[in-house]
């Protein structure tokens, strides 16, 4: 019979397969590159505003707790039935709870109403901690609104007792349900919520760790307390 011959043993296939390998790899890489453009990355902002009142305390801001659907970089859309989907074409600059923690710290710093603010991992000695839960951070349809809801508790860092608690909610209209408009609306709503949180904390009566310099100047038995230089305190 005329025509091309067929390899008769397994070893006869090695040469042709070796010649095909580079072409197969190139085809796979080409397919991966043509899957679509990379999503646009969006950040959240930290608003700046002068806030009256000052608590003068040291605050630690913990990363908000969140359900798995919110512990993501994806932009979430929720319809009237409660069904959740992820909006294509965009993503957040970091895992959402961690990004919100950073921007809330920045908002406190921008307001300049707190003596010091940092993360628990900083090792700073604090008067209180802000423990929070991210409840909602999504685009609601068909109303086309950005919805943000955060539950915040002020906790005495010396004994773990809850000093106060409040739920903060904010909404912002969204022109259309696409990545750019969704990110803009959620950033606007979060800015409102974060400013409300800073005002609330700054205006609250909060516990403070005992300041050694502010303790009584006498020891038990009436002995005068002296500083390290041996002189009575001023």
Regions from the PLM with identified roles:
Residues 64, 133-137, 169-170:
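Generic short beta-strand segments
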Residues 111, 115, 197-200, 204, ...:
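Solvent-exposed amphipathic alpha-helical surface segments
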Residues 33-97, 126, 204-234:
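A structural "domain/chain start" motif
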Residues 1-31:
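Sec-dependent bacterial lipoprotein signal peptides
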Residues 82-91, 158-199:
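Short secondary-structure boundary motifs at beta->alpha junctions and helix caps
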Residues 97, 101, 105, 111, ...:
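Extracytoplasmic/secreted envelope proteins and their assembly/folding machinery
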Residues 66, 70-73, 152-154, 180-184:
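Juxtamembrane/interfacial segments around transmembrane helices
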Residues 34-52, 106, 111-161, 175, ...:
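Surface-exposed short loop/turn segments
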